[in-house]
Structure formats: structure tokens, C-alpha cells
């Protein structure tokens, strides 16, 4: 698949993203693979690219405003079928058991993980995401 990969932190005008060919990602247990139809760019993406948000994963495929169709299912996925339309959340994972998760404010979870920041996002032909965050 083709993907835009951020390999270094730099100002956007220094072109820190590179178009590369990568192997198609395979969904693991509880994950779906999305064939990306569109991925928006917002200020958060620019903060990630330019290093305004510290301690994220490199290299990374940015992009968290993802829409597309389910392309493949990992084991134990029950809520989606191939061809389903999906949107992918910025929030990608939480602990599920802290006070914030239990009261429905998962975005405050101290163990939260984010699409295009901790894990690869949607600036690619394919993206793998947890079923519960699509």
C-alpha cells in the first residue's frame, strides 16, 4: 500500500512526510482493516508533524479523521462485515477500567492511545483499527 510516513519532526514547509510503499497491514484479534476513502487534515495533525505534541511514535502514518470501508476482519470481530462504511476515531484505545472510562469520559483515560499519534493513522490506502474505536 502507499502511505505518507512521518519519519522526523519538522515544520510542514520542510516536507517531513514521505510517500512510501509498505506491506498491507493485517488486522489482529479485535481489529478491522479499513480501505481509506478519505482522511482529513486538521491542526492536531500539524501539531504531531511539527512536534508540538511530545512523545509520539516515529515513524508514524499520521491522520485521524478517517473514513472508508471495512476491507478485512481480524479474529473475534463481530460488529462489522466487509464493505461496511466506517469512521475512525482519534481515540484509539483506553484501559476501560479507570474512573474516566467507567463514567464515559474515556478521552481522559491516563492510558489512552490515539490514531496517527501512537498508532498508524489514515494517510494511507489501508488502516488497521480496533473494532471498538471505529
Where are each of the predicted segments found?
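NAD(P)H dinucleotide-binding glycine-rich loop of Rossmann-like/cofactor-binding domains
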Residues: 94-134
Amino acid at each position: 500500500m502507499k502511505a505518507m510516513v512521518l519519519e522526523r519532526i519538522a515544520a510542514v514547509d520542510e516536507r517531513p512526510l514521505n510517500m512510501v510503499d509498505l506491506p498491507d497491514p493485517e488486522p489482529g484479534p479485535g481489529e478491522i482493516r479499513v480501505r481509506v476513502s478519505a482522511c482529513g487534515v486538521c491542526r492536531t495533525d500539524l501539531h504531531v508533524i511539527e512536534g508540538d505534541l511530545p512523545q509520539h511514535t516515529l515513524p508514524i502514518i499520521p491522520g485521524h479523521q478517517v473514513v472508508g470501508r471495512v476491507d478485512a476482519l481480524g479474529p473475534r470481530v463481530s460488529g462489522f462485515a466487509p464493505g461496511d462504511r466506517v469512521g475512525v476515531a482519534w481515540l484509539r484505545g483506553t484501559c476501560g477500567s479507570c474512573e474516566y472510562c467507567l463514567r464515559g469520559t474515556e478521552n481522559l483515560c491516563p492510558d489512552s492511545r490515539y490514531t496517527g499519534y501512537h498508532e498508524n493513522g489514515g494517510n494511507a490506502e489501508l488502516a488497521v483499527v480496533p473494532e471498538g474505536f471505529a
